[in-house]
Amino acid sequence: MVDTPYRKMLAAKIHRATVTGADVNYEGSLTVPPELLVAAKIHPYESLHVWNVTRGTRLETYAIEGLPNSNDVCANGAAAHLIRPGDHVILAAYAMVPEADAATHKPRLIFVDDNNQLSHVGPEIAGPNLRSDSDDTHLVRSTEMTPDGQPLAEGC
């Protein structure tokens, strides 16, 4: 029997959700509105990587389905020490993809607004380019600067 090689690939991402609550006394997990889970094709209890854009922290937990139409993204249990209301987070789920399919694999990428409402579905834009505020189909160059006045996009 020949083992099929696999690669761990991004399967789904919810980009820049706004955290609405944090409860250290809850047993654990990350509450996500069911509408976002369905849009991203993430299942309840699926493993999630949580990257806190605001604080720079990262953790792994699992998704728990919130109430319909609630827009609540809540850090529960120990995660509440690393994530606070108002933080922006990226939620990512991974899958093992057969090597033969890796080159054509396309993850499900969804982007949300500050109220955790779906704004659009993929594709992802590679840095140093950014989406235009007026039109998701147009790109602009990043104008962020380092403390010494150099463009942040250098070296991307």
UniProtKB/Swiss-Prot annotation:
Its EC number is 4.1.1.11. GO terms for biological process: alanine biosynthetic process; pantothenate biosynthetic process. CDD domains: Asp_decarbox (cd06919). This is Aspartate 1-decarboxylase. It catalyses: L-aspartate + H(+) = beta-alanine + CO2. It holds the Pfam family Asp_decarbox. Heterooctamer of four alpha and four beta subunits. It is found in: Cytoplasm. The keyword Transport does not apply. Substrate binds at T61, G77, A78, A79. Pathway: Cofactor biosynthesis; (R)-pantothenate biosynthesis; beta-alanine from L-aspartate: step 1/1. It is an enzyme of class 4 (lyase). Its cofactor is pyruvate. Keywords: Autocatalytic cleavage, Cytoplasm, Decarboxylase, Lyase, Pantothenate biosynthesis, Pyruvate, Schiff base, Zymogen. Its main location: cytoplasm. The modification Pyruvic acid (Ser) is found at S29. The active site is at S29 (schiff-base intermediate with substrate), Y62 (proton donor). Is synthesized initially as an inactive proenzyme, which is activated by self-cleavage at a specific serine bond to produce a beta-subunit with a hydroxyl group at its C-terminus and an alpha-subunit with a pyruvoyl group at its N-terminus. GO terms for molecular function: aspartate 1-decarboxylase activity. Belongs to the PanD family. Catalyzes the pyruvoyl-dependent decarboxylation of aspartate to produce beta-alanine. The keyword Phosphoprotein does not apply. GO terms for cellular component: cytosol. Binds 1 pyruvoyl group covalently per subunit.
